[in-house]
Regions:
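Active-site-proximal mixed secondary-structure blocks
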Residues: 1-121
């Protein structure tokens, strides 16, 4: 897209993660081998409510001055290029709006340029 290597990420507006993504030009996308139980907790508990990173015994590290996890197998460091909110009038399948957005808390879509890729051997 736009002659760049990009990723697309989606975050609901109430997610604590959104505050971190919005506060910086860059963010990380971290991918893991295993850690199913830990990742399930990270996806269901808010960092506003408890220190979930500590609870799962993950460790923050920085790559290109961007926070990520030491436990990640693959990390993309990306720079935001574009952000917009999913628009209900753009759904072709309108059942998605009804089923997935009863609170009308539409995801924010971020398009970001891949700056670096790190693979842990």
């Amino acid at each position: 897209l736009w002659n760049k290597d990009v990723v697309t990420a989606y975050i609901r507006p109430q997610r604590y993660t959104k505050e971190f993504v919005d506060s910086q030009d860059c963010f990380s996308l971290s991918f893991f081998d295993g850690y199913k139980k830990e990742l399930s907790l990270l996806g269901t508990v808010s960092g506003r409510d408890q220190n979930k990173i500590e609870d799962v015994d993950f460790h923050i590290t920085y790559l290109d001055n961007v926070p990520t996890f030491q436990e990640a197998k693959l990390v993309f460091i990306v720079e935001k290029l574009y952000a917009d909110t999913i628009k209900p009038e753009c759904f072709i399948d309108h059942t998605i709006d009804e089923q997935c957005y009863p609170q009308k808390d539409y995801h924010i879509m971020y398009i970001a340029k891949i700056k670096s890729v790190y693979v842990q051997e």
